[in-house]
A protein has these predicted regions:
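Structured catalytic cores of large enzymes
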Residues: 1-206
Length: 207
């Protein structure tokens, strides 16, 4: 049920919305999943010169130094209620910035121990230190319901030292309509669908 609560400083009563039942419609199809973006971001390092532009976000999460002291990073990614109805093309995105190198920057991304799951990203920015927005599509079958591991490795290029900072990571995925801790947030992209929501502790649900 939806209610419209208003306040009007006059003697007339405010507008009221009637109560209306909305039982399942046997004609409308049930939406099988919804699309969402899972974002991973923490502010651990402040670098005023990274990225190069003043208006950029200068708080960064972590770094790799290849091949010497810190060539690899791993991040735990917990995903729930993944839609496995049909395979689809998921999307991995990252915001990264090169800090120091003698040549090209190179980084390899992988998910759940599969070196071919994502891809390497190579770029050269000389001394500008611009933000790089990485977008890599991948097969959804690589994802696991539960804990996933994102691994980042520095990789061989034409340099002897490669220093890279990482700001955030995103996964564009599909999920089932199942509540997490009695909460479920999703966007309705178009009309003509009905939605079956599961996983709530009680039948009384606020929308």
């Amino acid at each position: 049920n939806v209610y419209w609560l208003t306040y009007e400083p006059s003697p007339d009563p405010g507008l009221r919305m009637p109560r209306r039942d909305a039982p399942p419609d046997p004609v409308l199809a049930v939406s099988p999943f919804y699309s969402t973006t899972v974002r991973l971001e923490e502010d651990e390092y402040y670098r005023s010169q990274l990225p190069w532009t003043e208006a950029s976000d200068h708080w960064l999460w972590d770094r790799t130094i290849y091949p010497s002291s810190r060539p690899t990073l791993t991040f735990a990614v917990e995903l729930s209620s993944l839609s496995t109805l049909v395979p689809y093309e998921a999307l991995f995105s990252a915001s990264i910035v090169g800090y120091f190198t003698y040549g090209d920057h190179c980084v390899q991304f992988s998910l759940n121990g599969s070196p071919s799951s994502l891809d390497s990203y190579i770029w050269s920015d000389d001394s500008r230190k611009d933000e790089q927005l990485v977008h890599i599509p991948f097969d959804s079958s690589i994802l696991r319901d539960g804990m996933n591991e994102l691994r980042i490795d520095g990789c061989l290029s034409d340099t002897t030292l490669d220093f890279i900072y990482y700001d955030w990571f995103e996964l564009d995925i599909r999920r089932n309509y199942e509540a997490d801790n009695d909460t479920l947030a999703f966007k309705v992209a178009e009309e003509g669908w009905q939605y079956q929501l599961d996983g709530f502790a009680t039948k009384a649900v606020e929308i």
